[in-house]
Amino acid sequence: MMEIDKKFITKLLSEAAENPRLRQNYDLRTSSDDNSQRMLNALLPGTVVPIHRHPNSTENVLLLHGKLAEVLYEEERLGDGIEPGDGIEQKPDKAIGRHLHETARIVMDPSSGSYGCIVPAGTWHTVEVLEPSVIYESKDGKYGEDGSETV
């Protein structure tokens, strides 16, 4: 049995402080054959988590320690400047660029009664770390094989 207690959280945060990325994860899966992701993630202010999405899975995020904001975005596809009737074949699924605009910011802080969130599949998101924090996160699919995309 493994106990996730104050001592373990403190150790994980110390490891994050020594990591140049200012974060450290701890894999909670019991086997590499497990087709899911379940982990603890220690995050320090200043860490950069790129805006990303998981097209095929929701992401469950529970804050165990600290304070952070889960930031959600909506994608606006930007066209290529070609007007209908120009005689050039248009491919509506191939936008030249994209613009993301913030749609929600969920501040998780156990002292204020906010403990976590579920990010819908396909939603662009990131986190802003407001205090040293540890989250439990889970989603479907093996890491690196789940179809995740970054901006």
Predicted features along the sequence, with ranges:
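A short, N-terminal "cap"/entry segment at the start of jelly-roll beta-barrel domains
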Residues: 1-36, 50, 81, 92, ...
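Short acidic-glycine-tyrosine-enriched beta hairpin
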Residues: 75-85, 89-122
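Short, surface-exposed charged micro-motifs
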Residues: 40, 60, 126
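Glycine- and acidic-residue-biased ligand/ion/polar-headgroup-sensing regions
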Residues: 56-78, 92
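Short beta-strand His + acidic residue motifs that chelate non-heme Fe in jelly-roll/DSBH
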Residues: 50-52, 70-71, 117-119, 125-130, ...
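Conserved short histidine dyad/triad with adjacent acidic residue
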Residues: 40-55
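Double-stranded beta-helix
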Residues: 4, 8, 13, 96, ...
